[in-house]
Curated annotation (Swiss-Prot):
Tissue and organ expression note: Shows dynamic spatial expression throughout development. First expressed in the animal pole region of the egg and this pattern persists through to the blastula stage. In gastrula and neurula embryos, expressed mainly in ectodermal, neural and epidermal regions. Neural tissue-specific expression pattern persists into tailbud stage when expression is localized to the brain and spinal cord. At early tadpole stage, expression becomes gradually confined to the specific vesicle regions of the developing brain. At stage 39, expressed in the telencephalon and mesencephalon regions of the brain.
Claim: Cell membrane is one of the keywords in the record: no
One GO term describing the cellular component: nuclear inclusion body
Subunit structure: Monomer and homooligomer. Binds RNA as a monomer and oligomerizes when bound to poly(A).
Species per Swiss-Prot/TrEMBL record: Xenopus laevis
Gene: pabpn1-a
Superkingdom of origin: Eukaryota
CDD domains, per the entry: RRM_II_PABPN1
Protein name: Polyadenylate-binding protein 2-A
């Protein structure tokens, strides 16, 4: 029984000593850092949080109130976790800002390039439009030599024919200047026309000369059967082709003449008085049989 009582007394003493250790400085007046290791760990954690706050000031240039409150007010693990989250958020905010700055620098350059490309395209379209307009004007405007007859009315054409003559048996190498010089003494020459075959491009051997007045036509008839480039030319007033008129100045129907002209080789003696040298023989197979006779 004595052994049991001694064991019980020892356990009671140990229990009392444990209560004194938990009580801390209020019971014995000692420093909590000596008997309570948890108290010393809390101070060290606060010092570490302060050091981390100072480092964040050097990196970010400023500290938010949330860092200090998170470091001192929270527990050891909670304060450190909140500080790391705040630092990560600041880094994430700074990085997008840098990227946004780079984009703002590149965007004006791209816009300038696009604007320049648009200007070049507009200039190209304007040039195409100008070229099309010039081509249309060139196609619509006839040559100066053909502009007059195209716009002339029937009355004007008849009046011009009354001032013109037909010159036959003209040398194939003759030019308009030579014909104008040959008839220059008869009056002022307004225009000289030498007709050519549309298939071969060779001259047909006759020409038209238009004077400025009708008196010159009567004067030019004196040059009938005169020599021009070694040939005896035929000079007669130009006849105006009128629609609906089937007769000619020769006194026989025009349709009858054309029907016989298709076989002019067998009846060439009939027309030999008008044309000393039938010119239809030069264009064998290609020139029309009527080209040597029809002056108009």
């Amino acid at each position: 029984m004595a052994a049991v009582s001694s064991v019980a007394s020892l356990r009671g003493a140990d229990y009392e000593n444990g209560l004194r250790g938990v009580a801390g400085p209020s019971d014995g007046g000692q420093d909590p850092g000596e008997d309570d290791p948890m108290g010393r760990g809390t101070l060290d954690l606060e010092m570490e949080l302060l050091e981390q706050g100072r480092r964040s000031r050097r990196v970010g240039g400023r500290t938010t109130p949330g860092r200090r409150s998170g470091g001192r007010g929270g527990s050891g693990g909670g304060g450190a976790g909140g500080l790391e989250e705040l630092e990560d958020e600041e880094l994430e905010e700074e990085e997008p800002g840098e990227l946004t700055g780079d984009q703002t620098i590149e965007d004006p350059e791209l816009e300038a390039i696009k604007a320049r490309v648009r200007e070049m395209e507009e200039e190209a379209e304007k040039l195409k439009e100008l070229q099309n307009e010039v081509e249309k004007q060139m196609n619509m405007s006839p040559p100066p030599g053909n502009a007059g007859p195209v716009i002339m009315s029937v009355e004007e054409k008849m009046e011009a024919d009354a001032r013109s003559i037909y010159v036959g048996n003209v040398d194939y190498g003759a030019t308009a200047e030579e014909l104008e010089a040959h008839f220059h003494g008869c009056g002022s020459v307004n225009r000289v026309t030498i007709l050519c075959d549309k298939f071969t491009g060779h001259p047909k051997g006759f020409a038209y000369i238009e004077f400025c007045d009708k008196e010159s036509v009567r004067t030019s008839l004196a040059l009938d059967e005169s020599l021009f480039r070694g040939r005896q030319i035929k000079v007669v007033p130009k006849r105006t082709n009128r629609p609906g008129i089937s007769t000619t100045d020769r006194g026989f129907p025009r349709a009858r003449y054309r029907a016989r002209a298709s076989s002019y080789s067998s009846r060439s003696r009939f027309y030999s008085g008008y044309t000393p040298r039938p010119r239809g023989r030069v264009y064998r197979g290609r020139a029309r049989a009527t080209s040597w006779y029809t002056p108009y």
